[in-house]
Amino acid sequence: MPVGTCESLCKDNIVISPEYYGTTQHSLESPNFVVLGGNENYCCKVTQLYSRVKNGAFSYIYVDWKTAELAKYMENCWIATKVTFCNEFADIAKAFGIQYERLRQCFVADERVNPSHTYVYPEQPYYDSHCLNKDIPALLVSCKSNKIKPPLTDKVHMINLERKSK
């Protein structure tokens, strides 16, 4: 969903909650947080619905529409960047005769580095998931139509396309 979609609908009673379906860490089956964008009164009503369906045993983050629309794009761009970064370091390690898994263990030992998405697969040295494949290009299109240039995200996307084509 392009950033600004809810605002363009001009309906105060719209609440957006970015989806995290499928096999992601933040699946709807066991979420640890829910982002709700919109009027706070309506967000509270949605929170009440969640508490009835899923016992509400997770945190709620209330934000405006645009922030909610951009939040999932930001998360998926970070994951795409991390996958691309780790695959690049796997290539560098291989060139130096170093086992990537040993290098990765050193990297994730630092508490500031989350180990998710740091594994690499030689037969697939790129990201290829439904969400990343749709969200990264969608964000780039949305940015372009708003005259925004995100050079890092654009480069990550281009590197991924190059790796897929090999």
Tell me what each language-model feature is:
Residues 1-166:
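Structural/interface elements that position substrates and couple domains in central-metabolism enzymes
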